[in-house]
Amino acid sequence: MQNNVSLRLAKRIWEVVEKEFESGELFEKVSPITKELLRFWFCEPFISQRQFNFHKGQKQSILNIIYLHEVLKINNVLEIYEQVAPDLLLESDLFGAKETRNSLKESRYDLPKYLVKMATGTGKTWVMHALLIWQILNAKNEEEKSGRFTKNFLIVAPGLIV
């Protein structure tokens, strides 16, 4: 059931993000740098001028993470559930229904964590590149440092496959 709940959470996030992206509302909630990047990555005339573009799964991953981090300002795993799909906390059997909320308050969950579930060969590295660029450019151009963006990264990749 845990995987089912996680996938349903991802679907709920995407439903909100896709609606806001298509309506243009998302562009008003992000920084000017993010707005420019999103237009360059996902909008006309740019996408028709390039030979290669992000595919739907990559776009979904990038937009979801940007939405959670920059728009909702998520600080931990529990906040994702509380802000996007509180009803899924009750259905989750991560630790037993009653314990899930308290367990997600533990210090090991007390930082932003984003998971991108993509199969081998579907472009996870391109998603990571985009997210690193998004973080670096926003960190470099923030007038007041918010702590939401960074120029420092540690990427741990087992073997040859990320």
Q: What are these model-predicted stretches?
A:
Residues M1-K29:
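Charged, low-complexity intrinsically disordered regions
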Residues F21, I65-H69, Q135-A139, V162:
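Hydrophobic, Leu/Ile/Phe/Ala-enriched alpha-helical segments that form helix-helix packing faces
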Residues E25-K117, W126:
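Conserved pre-motif I regulatory segment
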Residues I47, N138, E142-E143:
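Secondary-structure transition/capping motifs at alpha-helix termini
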Residues R108-L111, E144-T150:
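Short helix-terminating capping/connector loops at secondary-structure junctions
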Residues T120:
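The conserved Walker
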Residues K124-A139:
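Motif I (Walker A/P-loop) of helicase-class P-loop NTPases
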Residues W126-V127, S146-V162:
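Conserved Walker A/P-loop ATP-binding site and its immediately adjacent core
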